């Protein structure tokens, strides 16, 4: 392990930031050879939001494995009570802005969700159109409405736990 660490040192976002900024400005063949489809932004809970370049092949791999892994995680941990039901995936597909060169910037999951929209009805309670709603409160209401109608609701998930907490607080607030 020490040899590996010596030859491949650990890095962090700061080490790549100037390259990512160049990519955001439209420069190609930096860090990746494919075109950047979109930049996912982090939640910013640990500081300034970071941009993560997403390519077609990276998005396909991430979407495929995230969907499979999340379903498998739920099954492995709740198999005695698993009902093979859908889950409430609190996510959106709203593009928040664009880079100077016109590349979309959205939450890290938005770009991937757009590309798997055909699978969404089989895995999640909310239709894809709910994920397109820009008003966060309206979107939370709709996600909850569809989830509460699902008799075999198996799980509630989101990429960011803070979104699940917001959703549950919203439910408590509006329960009456």
Roles of regions detected by a PLM:
Residues 2-176:
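Active-site phosphate/ATP/adenylate-binding loop shared across adenylate-forming ligases
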């Amino acid at each position: 392990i020490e040899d590996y660490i010596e030859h491949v040192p650990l890095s962090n976002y700061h080490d790549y930031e100037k390259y990512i900024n160049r990519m955001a400005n439209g420069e190609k063949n930096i860090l990746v050879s494919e075109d950047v489809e979109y930049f996912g932004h982090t939640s910013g809970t640990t500081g300034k939001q970071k941009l993560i370049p997403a390519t077609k092949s990276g998005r396909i791999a991430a979407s495929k494995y995230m969907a499979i892994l999340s379903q498998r995680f739920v099954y492995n941990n709740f198999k005695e009570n698993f009902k093979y039901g859908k889950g409430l995936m609190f996510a959106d597909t709203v593009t928040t802005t664009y880079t100077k060169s016109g590349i979309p910037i959205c939450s890290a999951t938005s770009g991937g969700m757009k590309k798997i929209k055909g699978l969404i009805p089989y895995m999640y309670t909310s239709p894809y159109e709910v994920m397109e709603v820009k008003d966060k409160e309206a979107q939370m209401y709709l996600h909850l409405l569809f989830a509460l109608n699902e008799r075999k609701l198996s799980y509630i998930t989101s990429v960011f736990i803070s979104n699940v907490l917001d959703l549950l607080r919203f439910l408590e607030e509006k329960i009456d």
